[in-house]
Amino acid sequence: MRPLRNVTAPSISRRRFLHHAAAMAAGAGSARLLIAQTGTSQKPEAPSATRAAHRVFVASFSHETNTFHPVRTESYYYPKTDVRPFNLAVWKDAGLELVPGVSAHPSGGGTVEGKACREALDRILGSLRASLPVDAVFLRLHGAMFAEGIGPAESVLVEEMRNVLGPKIPIACTFDLHGNIPMRLARFGDILIGHKTAPHTDGGQIAEQAGSLLLDAIRGRIRPVSYILPVPIVLPGEKAMTTAEPLRTLVDEARRIEREGVAGHPARILAATIFVGCAWTDSPDTGMSVMITADGSRKAARAAAIHLAGRIWDARGQFAFGCETAELEEGVTRALEAEESKVLLTDSGDNVTASTPGDLPIVLRHLVERKVPHALVFGIQDPQSVARCFAAGEGKTVRLSIGAFIEKRFGPPFEAEAQVVRLVKDRRAAAVRIGGVTTVLGAAFMGGPGDYEPFGLEPSDYKVVVTKCGYCFPGQDRIAPRHIMLLTPGAGDMRLDRLNYVRRKRPAFPFEKDAQFDPEAAPA
């Protein structure tokens, strides 16, 4: 067998990503559209018995759209598809050729503008046509991209790829556990698998699982069939973590079904995924769902989906925040009075991992006005203030109008005299001190373990550390022995009843407490 080699699709060029925040700093509404050229289209061919290797088209297309973000996403960036994540261990000696197509990712957090999305879809599809013939397709998706006039864009991509390929070429897709998955996707994708962990730690595992199944499908060992069953429950991800009940037990049941199958159906269950969904994407598909891939039996896939959906529905009242929570004032008071030497506060309403603007100064203002000593806010997206800091220089004092340059619905910028502590040129960011509070300005950093060092900051030097996320990600839990999630306002508000939903499914729990759901009524 020939080893894996990378084959570049013809006539494809890509430009580097221009960051959204840089464009905003220049006064633009979003980053400019970056275009990838594709080659001429060809008609699909059946796999050739004379070719030395099976050709697998690989690409990524993902976004966690926050429709409550005040600014539309009007552009995509087109990074060169990195085939390294597709160099799977299960493919090492399989004699496959990886054919990288165009990958596309929106450059902002808000609802994707329809024209830009349509162009991105056409670029990806054009690169697929230019790469034909192929024997299979492997896509890395998210599942929560939402575009004006298009809807669930990732699902639309799979549908349109199926139209190009015809019915026989297998398509494998991996998803984030927080995807909002349309039921119709199962008609077009063959192998559909999502994360089983939140916080996510199993990306490599699900890629290997999908890759193994795709290889089996290419070789004719399996005939994958998928089924998707929506469950009318809409929750913030912080109420559905696989480290806590009830999702931990529900995911264990999904794993058991993969091992043992479903009663009364001899067909093997190849993959079973429970999706939490993304609550900040207001769409008809928003919410929990079950995705099953079975070997040759839609009935078995449906039965497994019904079983898991019923278990989820029965547990709907058990979902709760998996960490300590508090309103802003109370949370800060608890942190200051805590016996623990350090406390991590997360600004959940402006949680950048939920595609918020990341520019709200609400927590910073509160800490400064309360004269809190030894606090670190990491960080606030604000390229204008960063520019002023660079103009002033390290050690200088400068008047700043911090934050609220995108998100203006929750209060004005925070006006303050700040001392410039550190400038980091390659990140175009600045650390400043206001009273006893140090804050990092620039991109909306999540505050992961590797983020602090370039600024000369050590989280252990502070009693209170604030980051713009919800639950703790791997590594963040080492910052402090105690974590309090602040229930702050913003586009990522954990209090979903404070958000203005227009398109979500109705009835849905917990919005409609008396919502009814019968999984047995799922289409055959």
What are the language-model segments listed below?
Residues 11, 32-55:
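C-terminal segment of N-terminal export signals and the immediately downstream linker at the start
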Residues 13-27:
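N-terminal export leaders
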Residues 59, 64-71, 84, 96-129, ...:
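Metallocofactor- and cofactor-centric catalytic cores in central/energy metabolism, strongly enriched
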Residues 313, 426-524:
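Extended hydrophobic packing segments that form well-structured cores
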Residues 238-435:
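Hard-cation-handling environments
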Residues 1-12:
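N-terminal secretory signal peptides
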Residues 47-93:
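N-terminal amphipathic/basic leader segments beginning at the initiator methionine
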Residues 57, 62, 114-118, 131-223, ...:
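Active-site histidine-anchored catalytic micro-motif
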